[in-house]
Amino acid sequence: MAHYPTRLKTRKTYSWVGRPLLDRKLHYQTYREMCVKTEGCSTEIHIQIGQFVLIEGDDDENPYVAKLLELFEDDSDPPPKKRARVQWFVRFCEVPACKRHLLGRKPGAQEIFWYDYPACDSNINAETIIGLVRVIPLAPKDVVPTNLKNEKTLFVKLSWNEKKFRPLSSELFAELNKPQESAAKCQKPVRAKSKSAESPSWTPAEHVAKRIESRHSASKSRQTPTHPLTPRARKRLELGNLGNPQMSQQTSCASLDSPGRIKRKVAFSEITSPSKRSQPDKLQTLSPALKAPEKTRETGLSYTEDDKKASPEHRIILRTRIAASKTIDIREERTLTPISGGQRSSVVPSVILKPENIKKRDAKEAKAQNEATSTPHRIRRKSSVLTMNRIRQQLRFLGNSKSDQEEKEILPAAEISDSSSDEEEASTPPLPRRAPRTVSRNLRSSLKSSLHTLTKVPKKSLKPRTPRCAAPQIRSRSLAAQEPASVLEEARLRLHVSAVPESLPCREQEFQDIYNFVESKLLDHTGGCMYISGVPGTGKTATVHEVIRCLQQAAQANDVPPFQYIEVNGMKLTEPHQVYVQILQKLTGQKATANHAAELLAKQFCTRGSPQETTVLLVDELDLLWTHKQDIMYNLFDWPTHKEARLVVLAIANTMDLPERIMMNRVSSRLGLTRMCFQPYTYSQLQQILRSRLKHLKAFEDDAIQLVARKVAALSGDARRCLDICRRATEICEFSQQKPDSPGLVTIAHSMEAVDEMFSSSYITAIKNSSVLEQSFLRAILAEFRRSGLEEATFQQIYSQHVALCRMEGLPYPTMSETMAVCSHLGSCRLLLVEPSRNDLLLRVRLNVSQDDVLYALKDE
């Protein structure tokens, strides 16, 4: 078997920390801490009781998650072993595929579930522990964070008890919070830790929220073109970020003026929508943060006496970047210093905002203003409202609790009436523009991780329309199925082989034996194998399906432990080794090659400590899985022998002595002695099966059912053949010419005709229905074979015999061309084997059926 290249695993050394405590009742030593050292690395991990750990499992990418409850050393065997007792968590991929719909939503990528199932094995090998993991419990109303890069942070919100998902109880929620708080205290620091992990100032929820914000701010800054920021935007963003003193120190160096002028703090953020940046003179309302005098004093903005004497409305207009009226004299000089070329500070000529300067620059900016304001103001405000609606949807999607407050601060002037906005727009002259400069990419990258910015609304994902992306599915019925129009049509539906009957008659004992075998394995949490044999059509597969259906109902009623059912059929496989692929895909949903799937299944059923439920595997048509090495049969029968497998195999084949006839000794020994043979149905059993199918339906005469049952029981005892004959009899009865007063029941004549069609050869039927000239040509072939003593003759010899037979019977003999056409037609029906017609008279002719069958078909009735 070819092996795939696997990842090189580092060797780890496990040792106890501290003195042991002797448990006199269980006679082993317990510990409170364990040290894990990795070969070739100077770091070490200290694991204590109560922490959450990762444990080796079947999938290296998704190891098992558990809470460490106890550490002890088992010295019952000569080499002492390090053992641990844990409380398991389960991932969504570990939940059975048939029960994943019970969650009712899409699970988070890093969401796990508390495994509330006491019957699982919680005693594991302590040397299978990989490392520590952080588990954060969430309340039922909390949203599981998504798209987090920290793989060692998991979230638990619900519990899973093999039947349904439940929210965490208050006691369990408090218990999960306790070790989370003490984990940082009891865990010793490791050199490889980063500064962010060591800082105790952030709570887990705030840490996750900051990472989400930094990612969205980074994506937004890459998509947004660089534009100079207006004083209004600077003041507003500056006031919005007063709570972060570190941010103020970083951004205060970005805009420096001369010593005589005022220093201003600038915080760059892409809060405004693209439509607002393209139209800087748009009317805006003052945010609540700008109206607070306390926050205004913290920003370091100083006003002159004229500004203090001015009314609040004028001060609002000054801060919100709306042009001042001509009667106000603004004498204070303010320096606008956009960052350019990677420099952290730059000095530019100051611009004095006075009415005279505004008048001079008004003419220069008129053309640019007309181009920028080509869209009506009312339409621009509607587009900004749409943008804000998209931002609100994105904030709800991220689950940010502060979204409502931030929306109020950046809400545009949507509540102002149309008339008042038009009047203000007509009375306010445009303010001067700044030439755009390139903002430093390095500075922007340093700031984008700490600023909270709003992200663009992701586009709706379109459904794939190309055939290569479309998922294959069975066509759905556009119209409802029509109900049977007659009694015979209803009988045909009930007699179909695939129709599921209400009961399974004549197999009560076999049903009980198989049910008891599987039920005992489920209750004992062990594995086993049963070999079921019998001729085709004796109800082997139907009986097993009925057993599984009853066990599934019992599992739902808590009578037996839950299990997973898998069925494979050797008839549906293109190659015997594909059985590994089918089992792995139905068990875990993974897709792999045959060799890789065999390795994964062997690891699944032979690894200790894996918290899995019992698997019932039905292998139908087992004889088709035979190979020269018989490795497939050996693996299927060897896996249930392992204690940790919890695998029950039900193998079905048509041969009773298959293990002794074709299996090796090592394979037949793994199969065991639990075998069951299904005997062919007798006449009375077949008659009972037919009557149970036609219950409360009068479509057959009693003698017609008895005739079919006796005929089939004498030949094979196949129930499927019996059902097919009865269905054909209903078709013959329906299409036969009957009198108007006939009862319309299937009689003995109809059943006899159906039996003859079923058991007679198709070649004989074709010869009986052939023309007189074709039957005469077949007689000529038999006469020539009898004359020459060979079973092959040329067309010329057969034509001579054909002419002689026609003269003896007084019939006009056909021409050579007509006889050649008859020979070609019989050859196309595969009654004859003929050479190509280019040989003409010398082409050789043979019979494709026996001479006795031809004589039987040509005899006079």
UniProtKB/Swiss-Prot annotation:
Residues 457-466 have a biased composition (Basic residues). The modification N6-acetyllysine is found at residue 326. Residues 45-171 form the BAH domain. It is found in: Nucleus. Phosphorylated during mitosis. It comes from the Eukaryota. GO terms for molecular function: ATP binding; ATP hydrolysis activity; chromatin binding; DNA binding; DNA replication origin binding; metal ion binding. Residues 440-456 have a biased composition (Low complexity). It is linked to Meier-Gorlin syndrome 1: A syndrome characterized by bilateral microtia, aplasia/hypoplasia of the patellae, and severe intrauterine and postnatal growth retardation with short stature and poor weight gain. Additional clinical findings include anomalies of cranial sutures, microcephaly, apparently low-set and simple ears, microstomia, full lips, highly arched or cleft palate, micrognathia, genitourinary tract anomalies, and various skeletal anomalies. PANTHER family: CELL DIVISION CONTROL PROTEIN 6-RELATED (PTHR10763), ORIGIN RECOGNITION COMPLEX SUBUNIT 1 (PTHR10763:SF23). This is Origin recognition complex subunit 1. It comes from Homo sapiens. The gene is ORC1.
